[in-house]
Amino acid sequence: MLFRSQDLAVEPMEARFSDDGRFTIYPETVGCWFDTEAAKTAWLAAGVAETIVVPIQVTIPAVTAASLEATLYHDLLGAMTTRYTNSGENRCSNVRLCASRINEHILYPGDVFSYNEVVGKRTEEAGFLPAPAYVGVGEDSVKDELGGGACQVSSTLYCASIFAFLETIERTAHVYPVNYIQLGTDATVTIPEEGGNVMDMKFRNNKNYPIKIVAYTEETEEMKSLTVEIWGTLEETDYMPVEFDNTASYTWDLVYDRVIEPAYPNREGYKIKFETERFSFEDAMGAGRRTITHREVYNSAGEKVLDEILNPTISTGYAMDTYYYHN
């Protein structure tokens, strides 16, 4: 029996993403066909019951599932590290637990991340322990609360998200400064058991590709630190980061300055920096300080190419009648 080559041929097809925005990968199809004339010649020349071999021509598509997968979560878009070296064990446990809840969380284009939804209620049943947290203003402003320390994780994630140029949906500052992050770049979160204001930290994936949150803690005898990274796909219009700088000129001299390898050596790298203006004030609540935080971008020549105010509709106010360094 003779077959036509088109009966056995398989057209090559490149791998592709699904069209539903979920970035499911449909694998490639390897093309194959054989030369019918060569097969016919070999068949006619063959003896009775002789086996003939017909070479198959194989075409590997240029875009494979592996190459598409390699484009996802390939580039470090934003990162932040904060320290909790002097925290008690309960607070350390809460930080580790919150970090584990947000770790490996994926956001597709248009998705909104809600810290409270992902981490969940800070309850004993969920594994949270009592640790110092802000609960008001004045002498009784710091008390042990279940989940104390959760705000360090939300604040670290908030900084990573604005380094990555993600869209902030909701963010509220603490009533007092915290010692693990620069003024104007913190983000408090609460889920009251009954009544009270729910405070969340939310941001949107405004990219054309999915992003992944990576969160981890490192603890030694000398230092305990929390790192949150946001991985995605660097697009042509994005600033390729080579340095993240969130340096505070404040009493505790907090410094975060991370240099990273350029994702694409043929593109210009940029330094992304937070700069905070501070204004003192006094009202019925006492002395305070307001901040306006800028996101600045510098090119490889050290020239400022972008200066924009974060949360431009309102400045961040902190009570300053005393200093507490919790949550």
Sequence positions of predicted segments:
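Well-ordered beta-sheet/strand-loop patches within structured domains
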Residues: 4-24, 28-327
